[in-house]
């Protein structure tokens, strides 16, 4: 009698965020199926959970058109090799984690060979290049979506999709410890505190830092005790911000932080930030915010024509209304930014109402995503 093959799950993660998701998924699957086998493209966290890495995740982690073009031959070789090897292995399910440009084509190749496929983390098809939804529908048996409006979008096009909640919402408490965060950062409990988050990319920091600093100067006039915290993602962004600050606001006292974005948000009465995942994290930290964003005029002109949503920030997309003030392009200037932040720093009705809505939205997307994803994989594997 031949021994039954263990449940075999193939996975491909292309960057750190995908490695974190993959590790959480593997952990949840191992609790249910201890002898399951995991193979594919994995980062250090997935490998620590027992995933066999046929390729290192860094091979796929390229950004920018020039970088991608330089590595295109290698990327195409890896994809062709994975198509062949997964085709021979015939895993019970293939899970492509984010990295849509690489994974969706791979998923399509595998689906044609009769392998069940899942795409974990929806690309922003609901916002732009909506026709990608048809390619995703052809390539995958199931999309796992973090946010409820993403599922609503796929339902409209009859693409199987499961809303699993957001892992970040699982990781962050419903009621953050503001005083604890202030202890960590050395901020007095009774001071007003503003977080400035000018983005994680060089272009964002270049475009936004001067206006954000000038806004903080204006707010200091109303709140002389204002503590300003500026978390920066790495040494490169910190140097860039320090250079801009030396030109624009050399005398403005601020706390520069290496990372610690989450602590800064929890500790602050209000935040001024670039859009993106930071806005979702800020909402989960229950920190009232204003989104300020600026890009090159042609890029903005193009984005306005391509983007199909009324809002750019995730809190507003989740709420379905302008919960958070968004000041874009010409609107993103110090006087307007300061005027939008003043009522939030006052800690009155406006910020309390925003805090309550943030808590409700947090509960909506706090669904134990790792467990939900594992359940979806096992159901498809049957």
Curated annotation (Swiss-Prot):
Gene that this sequence comes from: lpxB
Superkingdom, natural source: Bacteria
SUPFAM superfamilies with a match to the protein in the record: UDP-Glycosyltransferase/glycogen phosphorylase
HAMAP family: LpxB (MF_00392)
Chain's role: Condensation of UDP-2,3-diacylglucosamine and 2,3-diacylglucosamine-1-phosphate to form lipid A disaccharide, a precursor of lipid A, a phosphorylated glycolipid that anchors the lipopolysaccharide to the outer membrane of the cell.
Pathway: Glycolipid biosynthesis; lipid IV(A) biosynthesis; lipid IV(A) from (3R)-3-hydroxytetradecanoyl-[acyl-carrier-protein] and UDP-N-acetyl-alpha-D-glucosamine: step 5/6
EC number(s) given by UniProt: 2.4.1.182
Glycosyltransferase in keyword set: yes
UniProt protein name: Lipid-A-disaccharide synthase
Keyword set, alphabetical order: Glycosyltransferase, Lipid A biosynthesis, Lipid biosynthesis, Lipid metabolism, Transferase
Family: Belongs to the LpxB family.
A single BP term in Gene Ontology: lipid A biosynthetic process
MF terms in GO: lipid-A-disaccharide synthase activity; phospholipid binding
GO cellular component terms, A-Z: membrane
């Amino acid at each position: 009698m031949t021994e039954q093959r263990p449940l075999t799950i193939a996975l491909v993660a292309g960057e750190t965020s995908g490695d974190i998701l993959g590790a959480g998924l593997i952990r949840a699957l191992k609790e249910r199926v201890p002898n399951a086998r995991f193979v594919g493209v994995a980062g250090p966290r997935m490998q620590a959970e027992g995933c066999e890495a046929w390729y290192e995740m860094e091979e796929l982690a390229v950004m920018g058109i020039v970088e991608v073009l330089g590595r295109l031959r290698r990327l195409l070789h890896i994809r062709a090799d994975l198509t062949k090897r997964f085709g021979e292995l015939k895993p019970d399910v293939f899970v492509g984690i984010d990295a849509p440009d690489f994974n969706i084509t791979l998923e399509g190749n595998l689906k044609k060979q009769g392998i069940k496929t899942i795409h974990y983390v929806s690309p922003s098809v609901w916002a732009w290049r909506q026709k990608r939804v048809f390619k995703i529908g052809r390539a995958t048996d199931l999309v796992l979506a973090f946010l409820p409006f993403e599922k609503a979008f796929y339902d409209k096009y009859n693409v199987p999709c499961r809303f699993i909640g957001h892992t970040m919402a699982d990781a962050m408490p419903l009621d953050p410890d503001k005083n604890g965060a202030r202890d960590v950062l050395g901020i007095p409990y009774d001071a007003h505190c503003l977080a400035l988050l000018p983005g994680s990319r060089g272009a964002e920091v270049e475009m936004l830092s001067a206006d954000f600093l000038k806004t903080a100067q204006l707010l200091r006039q109303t709140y002389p005790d204002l503590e300003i915290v500026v978390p920066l993602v790495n040494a490169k962004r910190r140097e860039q911000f320090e250079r801009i600050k030396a030109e624009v606001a050399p005398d403005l006292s601020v706390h520069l932080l290496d990372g610690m974005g989450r602590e800064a948000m929890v500790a602050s009465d209000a935040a001024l930030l670039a859009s993106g995942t930071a806005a979702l994290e800020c909402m989960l930290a229950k920190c009232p915010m204003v989104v300020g964003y600026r890009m090159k005029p042609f890029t903005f002109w193009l984005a306005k024509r391509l983007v199909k949503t009324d809002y750019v920030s995730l809190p507003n997309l989740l709420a379905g209304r302008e919960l958070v003030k968004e000041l874009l392009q010409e609107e993103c200037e110090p006087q307007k930014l300061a005027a939008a932040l003043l009522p939030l720093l006052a800690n009155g009705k406006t910020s309390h109402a925003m805090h309550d809505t943030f808590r409700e939205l947090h509960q909506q997307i706090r669904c134990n995503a790792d467990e939900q994803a594992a359940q979806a994989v096992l159901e498809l594997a049957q």
